[in-house]
């Protein structure tokens, strides 16, 4: 991947959702919503405060995160659909 996020932005790859419900019903791809979970592939260096000091991000590469349905900007890189979003658009980190 040749994308390097700037400031407080992160690159996220959406994780595939289950296409079958707990009761065994298969959800067709056309009816499925976009997943709201993803894995962080790259992080920017962080914002700068009023004095110019860098504020590091709370997320790191490999974190599994939750984000809003309309969060981020979709980009295609090497045939993969990725999201570029600000750290503030991330709602939570999924603990393993």
From Swiss-Prot:
Does Ribonucleoprotein count among this protein's keywords?
A: no
One example of a Gene Ontology biological process annotation: chaperone cofactor-dependent protein refolding
| Pfam families the record matches | Cpn10
Quote the CDD domains the UniProt record gives. cpn10
Under PANTHER family, the record lists: 10 KDA HEAT SHOCK PROTEIN, CO-CHAPERONIN GROES
Cell compartment(s), UniProt: Cytoplasm
Q: Which domain of life is it from?
A: Bacteria
- What is known about its subunit structure? Heptamer of 7 subunits arranged in a ring. Interacts with the chaperonin GroEL.
What high-level taxonomic lineage is stated for the organism?
Bacteria, Pseudomonadati, Pseudomonadota, Betaproteobacteria, Burkholderiales
Task: Return the similarity comment.
Answer: Belongs to the GroES chaperonin family.
Q: Which GO terms describe its molecular function?
A: ATP binding; metal ion binding; protein folding chaperone; protein-folding chaperone binding; unfolded protein binding
The protein's predominant localisation is: cytoplasm
Task: Name it.
Answer: Co-chaperonin GroES
């Amino acid at each position: 991947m040749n994308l390097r996020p700037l400031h407080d932005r992160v690159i996220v790859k959406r994780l595939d959702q289950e296409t079958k419900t707990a009761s065994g019903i298969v959800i067709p791809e056309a009816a499925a919503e976009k997943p709201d979970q993803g894995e962080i592939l790259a992080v920017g260096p962080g914002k700068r405060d009023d004095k110019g000091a860098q504020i590091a991000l709370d997320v790191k590469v490999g974190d599994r995160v939750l984000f809003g349905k309309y969060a981020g900007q979709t980009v295609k890189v090497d045939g993969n659909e990725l999201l570029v979003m600000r750290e503030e658009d991330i709602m939570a980190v999924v603990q393993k």
